[in-house]
Amino acid sequence: VKSTLAALLLLCLTAAASAEETAIGFRSSTLPDAQDNRPLQMVVWYPAATAATPELIADNPVFVGARGAPDAPPAAGEHPLVVLSHGYGGNWGNQVWLASALARQGYIVAAVNHPGTTSKDRSPQAAAQLWQRPKDLSRAIDAVLAQPTQFGAVAKQRIAAVGHSVGGWTVMEIAGARFDPVLFARDCDIHPKLGGCIGYKQMNPAGTPVGKAELVKDLSDKRVTAVVSLDLGLSRGFTDASLAALPVPALVIAGGVPTEDMSPELESADMVRRMPKASTQYVEIGDATHFSFMAICKPGGMALIEEDSPGDGMICRDGEGGRPRESIQQQVVELITAFLAHTGS
């Protein structure tokens, strides 16, 4: 028995070392648009051809970054693609832990900063164009597909989208869910303290006839073959019919620590009840908060955030008495990779 355990331990250590040694490339670019009124910052993590010297990416006094080799040549062969969507007021750096982990497992991962709802750009005019978020991901897919010499060749039948918070709403839209602003406004009268309702009110995307018309459109991208939502918001505005007919598999992960403005029972779990049972997986992580899906805070990081923006230090908190964020995120990575492998995405 001891020899078997020793062999298993050696196998695990070898696999871990191999994962660490996998060369990961990193590139940053800005995508112009036809009208030049919504330039999009995009970063891409990808399997690299050589073990180029890695650097810490998105590492700062508050958050732990991840290692990648800037501008390294991409590895040969085709690789599945994942596009990432951050939450309201966030940025691509929030999910570096996930992007780098997926790239180590052979995925090309593209993440964007959504204009108007990113910490890098809080323009009210851009924020009001909520319907542009799914289109941002489609633009990222276009850009990666068009530049195989930069990022590697994409296995076009394996394209997935992953999003946190309103990024979860974004990937559900790109999968085929349809939003009804009238339904959502009515629901927010009943649940005004939900974070999705508060953020939606600030953005006011249905404040004009044009905005309302854009929000109800089909924003799906048929190239996307699977989606993952991480503690999403705004889900109560999705129509029952569109959720019931969602054409791609979905993994819905929720933080199990409820707060006044974020409840899995009213968001993720409620949405899953309206989705196809055969192609939907739901996991509620009991010791995860809404912010457990963001980058790991460094010691002293919470104090620095509080100093700069009192009250926002809560983004460093996970479930009381629960596991450290690193362990929660390892579970999330395992859930996502197993789901994508199972669905062939």
Give names to the regions the model predicted.
Residues A126-G152, K156, W169, E173, ...:
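Alpha/beta-hydrolase active-site loop
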Residues A58-V62, G89, G93-W97, N113-K135, ...:
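Cap/lid segment of the alpha/beta-hydrolase catalytic domain
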Residues A49-G68, A185-T239, P258-M262:
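Mobile cap/lid helix-loop segments that gate and shape the active-site cleft of serine hydrolases
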Residues C12-A17:
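N-terminal signal peptide c-region/cleavage motif recognized by signal peptidases
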Residues A66-H79, L84-R122, R236, P258-M262:
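Short substrate-entry loop that stabilizes the transition state in hydrolases
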Residues A23, A245-R325:
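Active-site-adjacent alpha-helix of alpha/beta-hydrolase-fold enzymes
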Residues A161-G163:
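Short beta-strand immediately N-terminal to the catalytic nucleophile in serine-hydrolase-like folds
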Residues E20-L84, R104, P264, G301:
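Domain-level recognition of soluble alpha/beta enzyme cores
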